[in-house]
Each structure stands twice: as structure tokens, then as C-alpha cells.
């Protein structure tokens, strides 16, 4: 647990890795994943195709990071612990759900490996799950890991960091107290209050038709084409006139949602029935998986394995790599030694007394 070791390429142990969006963002900034895990077979195949044979297909509840000697020590533990139980789209069993409780396995990996830092990702719904008790418990669990971690959660909108998609996610960044590295979340780089404008869906999709991988078009019914002809750029099902025979009462607003070319896309989702794919404009059709991958900021040489539906799931579940690169850059001095250590204990004690709301506001106020 040396605090002075200088690392050229900080090493990552990645769990709940999916196809590797979070890892890719860190790799693009000079980090290297040396061990990874997921239980979804095709996501593991995609990860392996892009990062090499460092990922292990196994149920994380069957892995003991304290005794499994095949899991190496690392500089960073990262992962997006399963989010379905915390999503604002569905009901929120949160900590009472079998998936929500999996975050504790993430905490066990941090406890076993004692990395200098960890990054955990989850959906915005985590902020309100179990009436706010879920995130409070998660923070306390992370803070209690010896020798102590300063935990700073922040709600990111990845469109503000160069992703051509409005996508809100909570990132927890924890830094080991004995490093003396006071991590501060990076301020937005894109948008009306930043130095650069949003990267738009139209800009992101330029030339996408030339990409040979994961770019199959999906056949749709003539009725769907007729519905799309009634929906304007950036619109959705609610734009269909209520007196039109194609209108169905009770549809939720993100059904048959078409992109707006001069702004980032709405959130790309992983699954769902008819009308949830996300739809092109001006062409009356669903987005291809490669178009969805572009909107998630994946490069064209990132190849996804599996069926069209399976690839859709991987892309929709992924963390957009471009969205976390600023976090990876901000953490890098911790591993190069290019910082002046400070005593983190006063900050740690101060934040422990804060409510979750106060902590989030405090973390946002210090962004630079």
C-alpha cells in the first residue's frame, strides 16, 4: 500500500465490466485493465475482442477477492454495479433487490485490493432509491473500508463531457486517505455554460453508413413507418395527433423517439419492446447498433459480439467512454506522483457529517 509508487500505466481490476465502456474511457487515458469480470456471455466476448483475454466469465457472487490469488493487485477498481434496481424508469427495490445488493461485492473487491482509487457508476435513480437510504448506505460502506476512503459522488450528464447523448449517471470516486490526493470532479467541457458546444447527434452520425460492423438495419412494419412519418425531428409518440387511428392512449413518452440532429440524442436504453429502439431522422427507421454506439461515443473499431438484440443490450448498458475520460485524466496525477499530498482526514471527517444532499452540493461547488 505504498503511497509514493509512480506508475506509468495505472492498472485496473474491472468488475461488472459489461462490454467495456468504462474501461475504454480509462484505457484512452493511459490506464490498463489487467483483470475483469462479468457474467453475461456475449458482453464478455465483446470485452475480450477489444481488450484481450483478461476477462473472466463468472458469477461475481461465486468469487472471493480475499482468497482468489488469480486476482492481481491493482491501482484502481472500477465498475458499474448493476443498476436495474435503482433505475427511475422502473420500480425501485434498491437495497432490497437481488441486483441492488450486488454493490457490496464491489465494496469487497475494494476492501481486498486496497487500490489507491475506485470508481463506481450507477443510474440517477440511485439518488432517490429507498427514500435516499440506498445511496447513504453505499457511501457509508465505501467510507468504512480500511484504511479509509474519501468518497465523492457526483451526478454527471455525459453530454457535458463530449458525448453526443444526454445521459445522466452517478459516479462515485473514492481515494484512499493515506495517498493525500484530494480528487476534485472535473467541470463540464461542453454545453451552453462551457467552452465548447454540445457534440450533436447529427455530427456523431456523419459517415456512419460506411462502417461495416454492427450496422445492420432492422426490418419494421409498414404501420411503424406510417407512425414515424407523423413524428417530427426530436419528437416521440405523443406528437401523433390524438384523433389519428395510429394514436394509442397511455403510451409513455420515450416510445418512438426520433433523434434531433442539432443536439445530443436522448438516453440510449438497453432493452424494451416495440418503439424503444430510438429512431433515425430523417429516415423512417430504427437506429442501427453502430449508430447507437456512435451516440454512446464508442469508436468504429470497437466490435460488439452477439445478435442484434444482444448487441443493443450491451451498448445501452455501457458507460460512454468519452464521458469518463475527464475523470481518468483528473485521477492520473495520483499515479504519476505529480501532486502535493495534503491531509485528507479533516475533509473526510467533515463530509461524514453531511447528508447526501449536502455532500452532492459540496462536491459540485468545488469542481474546477
Region annotations inferred by a language model:
Residues 12-21, 26, 60, 71-90, ...:
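Conserved proline-anchored active-site loop of SAM-dependent methyltransferases
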Residues 40-41:
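Conserved SAM/SAH-binding beta-strand->alpha-helix loop
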Residues 66-74, 84-255:
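Class I S-adenosyl-L-methionine
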Amino acid at each position: 500500500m505504498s503511497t509514493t509508487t509512480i506508475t506509468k500505466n495505472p492498472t485496473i481490476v474491472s468488475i461488472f465490466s459489461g462490454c467495456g465502456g468504462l474501461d475504454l474511457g480509462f484505457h484512452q487515458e493511459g490506464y490498463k485493465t489487467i483483470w475483469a469480470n462479468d457474467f453475461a456471455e456475449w458482453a464478455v466476448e465483446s470485452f475480450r475482442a477489444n481488450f484481450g483475454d483478461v476477462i473472466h466469465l463468472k458469477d461475481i457472487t461465486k468469487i472471493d477477492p480475499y482468497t482468489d490469488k488469480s486476482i492481481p493487485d491493482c491501482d484502481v477498481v472500477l465498475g458499474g454495479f448493476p443498476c436495474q434496481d435503482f433505475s427511475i424508469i422502473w420500480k425501485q427495490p434498491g437495497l432490497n433487490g437481488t441486483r441492488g445488493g450486488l454493490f457490496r461485492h464491489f465494496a469487497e473487491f475494494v476492501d481486498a485490493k486496497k487500490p489507491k482509487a475506485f470508481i463506481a457508476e450507477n443510474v440517477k435513480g440511485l439518488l432517490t432509491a429507498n427514500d435516499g437510504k440506498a445511496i447513504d448506505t453505499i457511501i457509508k460502506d465505501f467510507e468504512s473500508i480500511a484504511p479509509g476512503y474519501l468518497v465523492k459522488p457526483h451526478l454527471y450528464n455525459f453530454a457535458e463531457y463530449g458525448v453526443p447523448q444526454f445521459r445522466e449517471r452517478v459516479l462515485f470516486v473514492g481515494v484512499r486517505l493515506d495517498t493525500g490526493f484530494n480528487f476534485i470532479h472535473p467541470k463540464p467541457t461542453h454545453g451552453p455554460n462551457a467552452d465548447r458546444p454540445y457534440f450533436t447527434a447529427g455530427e456523431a452520425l456523419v459517415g456512419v453508413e460506411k462502417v461495416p460492423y454492427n450496422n445492420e438495419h432492422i426490418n419494421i412494419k409498414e404501420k411503424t413507418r406510417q407512425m414515424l412519418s407523423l413524428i417530427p425531428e426530436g419528437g416521440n409518440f405523443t406528437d401523433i395527433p390524438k384523433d389519428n387511428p395510429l394514436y394509442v392512449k397511455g403510451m409513455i413518452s420515450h416510445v418512438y423517439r426520433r433523434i434531433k440532429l442539432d443536439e445530443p440524442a436522448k438516453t440510449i436504453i438497453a432493452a424494451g419492446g416495440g418503439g424503444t429502439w430510438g429512431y433515425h431522422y430523417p429516415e423512417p427507421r430504427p437506429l442501427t447498433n453502430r449508430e447507437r454506439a456512435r451516440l454512446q461515443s464508442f469508436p468504429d473499431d470497437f466490435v460488439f459480439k452477439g445478435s442484434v438484440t444482444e448487441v443493443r443490450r450491451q451498448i445501452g448498458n455501457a458507460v460512454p467512454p468519452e464521458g469518463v475520460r475527464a475523470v481518468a485524466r483528473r485521477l492520473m496525477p495520483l499515479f504519476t506522483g505529480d501532486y502535493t499530498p495534503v491531509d485528507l482526514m479533516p475533509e473526510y471527517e467533515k463530509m461524514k457529517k453531511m447528508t447526501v444532499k449536502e455532500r452532492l452540493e459540496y462536491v459540485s461547488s468545488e469542481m474546477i
